Regions:
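Ligand-binding pockets and gating/stacking loops
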Residues: 1-105
Length: 105
């Protein structure tokens, strides 16, 4: 699994973080980014989802980080909806999402 927490702004000079990036730089862009997954039953050469032509927004099959985590659990044979208990003995699901079944062979 290889992902970052942000993409890059689709246009130079757009400041989204307030860090004062220069007019020829790109800033963080949390609305659309890429990831790579391999092994553990993932389809070889498969591309899932699509962004618009500028890479600023997903337009087909977006995957939320929760769904990615559920897919990782699934690949290990762990049900993402497994109930675990925290330090206060409160029940919690590992993740409230379903695995992205299209990723798997």
């Amino acid at each position: 699994v290889c992902v970052g927490e942000f993409g890059r702004s689709p246009q130079m000079g757009i400041s989204t973080s307030g860090n004062g990036n220069s007019a020829d730089g790109r800033d963080h862009w949390p609305y659309c980014y890429t990831g790579v997954v391999a092994g553990a039953g993932i389809k070889r050469g498969y591309v899932h989802g699509e962004s618009d032509k500028t890479g600023s927004a997903p337009i087909e099959n977006p995957v939320h980080p929760r769904e990615l985590l559920a897919s990782i659990y699934h690949s290990f044979g762990i049900n993402p909806e497994t109930i675990v208990y925290n330090h206060l003995n409160q029940p919690r699901e590992l993740v409230k999402a379903q695995a992205v079944s299209e990723l798997f062979a």
